[in-house]
């Protein structure tokens, strides 16, 4: 019996059988969400034949990719193991949160810090990686491969490539009308294919980064003509706080008709204007934040070249406005890169943030960014000042960590990161409690500004960088490509407040606005004009 087991264990397999086996495994285990989306779009009862051909085409594509990537004997096993691990990791986040892997999502992943990564890890993730990644990889690693001679190997490899192409092309030809509609109307469904989509996006991102590295690094100016009509020596200096929000969605704002009072403190402050129809530039922090300060607008904006483009903060700094960015999130996403480092401060640790020990998770709170702002004002006495406060806000999936106990108004709450396993209302409760903390932070920001209203014309602008999915259609978090992102990820709250003495008039609450309105708003607040955005709608008149 022992001898029989030993012989079985060392039984050799053809490299082509091994490649085909991995392709079958990845097709079946890494694409559950893809097939679920397919069955929703094409009900199996009416489209069984077509749905089966999609499975065949996907297997053909998987077989082609694995064959091409592992064509050399010394890379065969490493490549197959890498594909198995990649399939396990990417499919977990796709199946759990609805994540798709375009270049923007990959950039987000690369910029995720240790705390954010920890929020995403759990027992289910580890079990998925072991079951669908590690164990199959061990089988690949230890199986004996019987490599043919070079000539036979080449012919068989070519045969496998031809077979792969046949598996792809024949069903497409046989169901040409179906596939014409599939590729034209339902193009976003392809984004759920793992690990093919991540592989494609990695290649695309590498190409983008190479072009960026070889491109000229000179700043492209968009507002050389910018002029400030009045200076602080001609009027009261202006003090503006811009709260860059995180992951807040407009339909959970009480001002917009939400049944819960999620912004009770703002509702008590005179002069707050809520904007109910604002669309974000993108669905991720890495994409949206640079866009919020860009001159290009969402239609022209390119996240890959944004750091080499003049933004509105560069302009205001050049004109003499004192700029400060405090960050309790990740960083400024390149917005502050061209300004002196002293104008940026990291408030995600107790080094700068004085309010980090009010919760069991030792998370630094957004309100800590308000501590010590009086010192900045004193150091820039009599000057125009713009202060950016970049929130942690409602960053998921651990919404329950984003607020102190005093904001736990809605209970019970989801206290885990496997959101689909939480009772849905408990997930909503945790998210809404985090909004209460944001309400408090904005209110305190306004109250701080009011203490300086005698010496300065004071104003506050709040806009969230993007929204959030909370389980609608099985999608969680954010980061979907704009082409098919749900409205929950792009419809964001925005508020404006100004002291009555400033004479500034906000736009109507139902004005249709986007992140494109931020740059002209910041310019107007400091009496600056620039031709590039002179016709762009702002949050103020």
UniProtKB/Swiss-Prot annotation:
Gene3D superfamilies: Alkaline Phosphatase, subunit A (3.40.720.10). It is a multi-pass membrane protein. Changing residue 465 to A: Abolishes transfer of phosphoethanolamine (PEA) to a lipid A analog in vitro. Almost abolishes resistance of E.coli strain Rosetta to colistin and polymyxin B, by comparison with the same strain expressing wild-type mcr-1. It comes from the Bacteria. Its main location: membrane. EDTA may inhibit activity. May be inhibited by ethanolamine. Disulfide bonds join 281-291, 356-364, 414-422. SUPFAM superfamilies: Alkaline phosphatase-like (SSF53649). GO terms for molecular function: phosphotransferase activity, phosphate group as acceptor. Zn(2+) binds at residues 246, 285, 465-466. Residues 1-14, 69-73, 144-157 are cytoplasmic. One of its GO terms (biological process) is lipopolysaccharide core region biosynthetic process. Keywords: Antibiotic resistance, Cell inner membrane, Cell membrane, Disulfide bond, Membrane, Metal-binding, Phosphoprotein, Plasmid, Transferase, Transmembrane, Transmembrane helix, Zinc. Monomer. Belongs to the phosphoethanolamine transferase family. This is Phosphatidylethanolamine transferase Mcr-1.
């Amino acid at each position: 019996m022992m001898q029989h087991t030993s012989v079985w264990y060392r039984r050799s397999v053809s490299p082509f059988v091994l490649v085909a086996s991995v392709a079958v495994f990845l097709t079946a285990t890494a694409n559950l969400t893809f097939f679920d989306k397919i069955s929703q779009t094409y009900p199996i009862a009416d489209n069984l034949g077509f749905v089966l051909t999609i499975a065949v085409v996907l297997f053909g594509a998987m077989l082609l990719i694995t064959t091409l990537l592992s064509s050399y004997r010394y890379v065969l096993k490493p490549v197959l193991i890498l594909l198995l691990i990649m399939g396990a990791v990417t499919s977990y986040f796709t199946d759990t949160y609805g994540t798709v892997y375009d270049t923007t999502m990959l950039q987000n992943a690369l910029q995720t810090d240790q705390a954010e990564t920890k929020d995403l890890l759990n027992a289910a993730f580890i079990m998925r990686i072991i079951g669908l990644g590690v164990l199959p990889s061990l089988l690949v690693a230890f199986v004996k491969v019987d490599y043919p001679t070079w000539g036979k190997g080449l012919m068989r490899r070519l045969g496998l490539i031809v077979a792969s192409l046949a598996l792809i092309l024949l069903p497409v030809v046989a169901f040409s009308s179906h596939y014409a509609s599939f590729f034209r109307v339902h193009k976003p469904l392809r984004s759920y294919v793992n690990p093919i989509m991540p592989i494609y996006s990695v290649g695309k991102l590498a190409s983008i980064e190479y072009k960026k590295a070889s491109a000229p690094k000179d700043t492209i100016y968009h507002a050389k003509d910018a002029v400030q009509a009045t200076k602080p020596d001609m009027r009261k200096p202006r003090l503006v706080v811009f709260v860059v929000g995180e992951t807040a969605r407009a339909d959970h704002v009480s001002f917009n008709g939400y049944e819960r009072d999620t912004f009770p403190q703002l509702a008590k402050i005179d002069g707050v204007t809520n904007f109910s129809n604002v669309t974000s530039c993108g669905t991720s922090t890495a994409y949206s934040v640079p866009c919020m300060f860009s001159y290009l607008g969402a239609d022209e904006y390119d996240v890959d070249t944004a750091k080499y483009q003049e933004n509105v903060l560069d302009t205001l700094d050049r004109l003499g406005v004192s700029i400060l960015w405090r960050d309790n999130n990740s960083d400024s996403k390149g917005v502050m890169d061209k300004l002196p480092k002293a104008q940026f401060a990291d408030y995600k640790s107790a080094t700068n943030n004085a309010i980090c020990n009010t919760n069991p998770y030792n998370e630094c709170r957004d309100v800590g960014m308000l501590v010590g702002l009086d010192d900045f004002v004193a150091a820039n006495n009599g000057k125009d000042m713009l202060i950016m406060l970049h929130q942690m806000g409602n960053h998921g999936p651990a919404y329950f960590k984003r607020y102190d106990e005093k904001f736990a108004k809605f209970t019970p709450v989801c206290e885990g990161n496997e959101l689909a396993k939480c009772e849905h209302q408990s997930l909503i409760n945790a998210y809404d409690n985090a909004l209460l903390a944001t309400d408090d932070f904005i209110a305190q920001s306004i109250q701080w500004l009011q203490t300086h209203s005698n010496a300065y014309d004071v104003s506050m602008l709040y806009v969230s960088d993007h929204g959030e999915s909370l389980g609608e259609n099985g999608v969680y978090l954010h980061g979907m490509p704009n082409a098919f992102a749900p409205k929950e990820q792009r419809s964001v709250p925005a508020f404006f407040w100004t002291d009555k003495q400033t004479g500034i008039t906000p736009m109507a609450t139902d004005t249709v606005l986007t992140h494109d309105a931020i740059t002209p708003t910041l310019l107007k607040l400091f009496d600056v004009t620039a031709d590039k955005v002179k016709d762009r709608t702002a949050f103020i008149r």
